[in-house]
Regions:
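A short, polar/charged loop-to-alpha-helix boundary motif
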Residues: 27-33, 160-169
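Short helix-start
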Residues: 245, 249-271
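Polyanion-binding surface elements
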Residues: 214-236
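DNA-contacting interfaces and partner/effector-binding or oligomerization modules
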Residues: 114-167
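A short, Lys/Arg-enriched interface patch at domain edges and termini
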Residues: 194-213, 264-271
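Broad phosphate/nucleotide-binding scaffolds in NTP-utilizing and phosphate-metabolizing enzymes
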Residues: 1-121
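Helix-turn-helix DNA-binding helix
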Residues: 239-240
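Short, solvent-exposed cationic patches
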Residues: 35-47, 165-184
């Protein structure tokens, strides 16, 4: 991750009007606006978010801002421009940094900074990012946040008005493919279908559970085939046979492993 302060050459205070976070491997950008950000000093495309009270700009609009400052991908002489700058392919990050983010439309530019130089209020925002997400039955989601908060969400309520989510709501396998967005900025299905962490944190039903408690359950109450065999005083082959005959029900399995709830293994022992 690389961090840049967005400054305005025409602003004599030289203060940062925004901060750009670049994730090179993921090829994603996010913009954070300071708490004291002034709409009149903020880049135009970002000021509209500020007026709505949003200070974290999602990946889509952050990338739009970046794209407005670099050579467009449909430029007729793009190949020559890339060769002249030693680039083998169109790389938004490299095109942005080679000019320090300057463009002819305004006086904004980028200055590299270290993580210790970002505003302290960003630390609090980071605590409200997503740590993990678990898909539950009936389009429910269990979302863990970095500050320890856990919330249960109904995706129907979250996204039913957004037609882009229809395939997710209509297909369980697609729904279960939910992932944490880059650096916890939200949850996503694929690259562009995302729900921001701020919306998730502000809504949903709080659950009296912590990530550590959840880990404790998994650590103490989930066993593999070898542990199940030891508990039942039998071989792994016997455990596999019980699973094949529907006497034990794996909660997760792959080509070379099976995981079981310890409680079910214990119940089998009593029969």
């Amino acid at each position: 991750m690389k961090i840049f302060a967005v400054r305005d050459e025409d602003n004599t205070t030289n203060k940062a009007v925004a901060y750009l976070f670049c994730y090179e491997k993921e090829k994603r950008f996010y913009i954070e606006l300071p708490e004291e950000a002034d709409p009149w000093e903020t880049p135009l495309i970002l000021s509209s978010f500020l007026k709505k009270g949003q200070k974290t700009i999602n990946a889509y609009w952050s990338r739009i801002w970046v794209q407005q400052r670099i050579v467009p991908s449909d430029r007729q002489n793009l190949g020559m421009i890339l060769r002249d700058n030693g680039l083998d392919f169109y790389d938004e990050y490299k095109l942005l940094t080679m000019t320090n983010g300057r463009c002819s439309q305004d006086s904004y530019y980028l200055e590299p900074i270290s993580e210790k130089d970002i505003p302290k209020e960003f630390v609090k925002r980071n605590q409200q990012k997503v740590e993990d997400v678990i898909p539950l039955p009936e389009n429910q989601l269990l979302v863990f946040f970095r500050d320890g908060c856990v919330k249960k969400h109904d995706l129907v309520q979250l996204a039913s008005t957004d037609k882009r989510f229809a395939p997710v709501l209509q297909n369980e396998n697609t729904f279960r493919a939910v992932n944490v967005e880059t650096d916890g900025y939200g949850i996503c299905w694929g690259e562009n279908l995302c729900i921001e962490c701020g919306k998730l944190y502000a809504t949903g039903k709080k659950v009296p559970l912590s990530m550590e408690e959840f880990k404790c359950f998994v650590r103490e109450r989930v066993v593999d085939s070898a542990e199940a065999a030891e508990e039942l005083a039998c071989s792994k082959q016997n455990v596999d046979d019980l699973a094949k005959r529907g006497k034990l029900h794996p909660i997760k399995e792959g080509a070379k492993y099976r995981l079981f709830l310890k409680s079910e293994v214990m119940q089998r022992k009593w029969k």
